[in-house]
């Protein structure tokens, strides 16, 4: 009698790793850790620097990066160039501008013109880019009424004093509107590294 043909053995699939579930778990953990550090390491570093500076007896003046258009905030140790006439409604435009400094909103005033000067430093909606776009104003929440802000514009210094600080929704765009009197309005995303809220600081001009 002819023998029955043997069934071919099914090939076993082997994985290069003993347990793919563990590997995937480690990858997810690593990604989560990277995002966490990207979001919170820079703010934590800035906070530590601020606390050390607050307890230090030395009070060194801050040097503006230029005298053409820049900002100095002594209380939080912030200095930055200001990029003029940036469209605040086009994320591609303002995120590019924010890699160079604080953005001045297109259509708002300039120092000495008697209108609302609107400056902003957004966080990115992209978690991996968040710290790039908000570092200048990370510590803005420490500002209180009476703190001073200096703007340099066309080789002239302008001094402003904080009069108000507010936490608003991202849809609150009324602070971009012109005023009949000169006002300096600063805006950043809050908490740092997110786009959940907007922190607004308002200041009025005083003599320099």
Where are these regions (language model features)?
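N-terminal Lys/Arg-rich, disordered targeting/topogenic segments
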Residues: 1-18
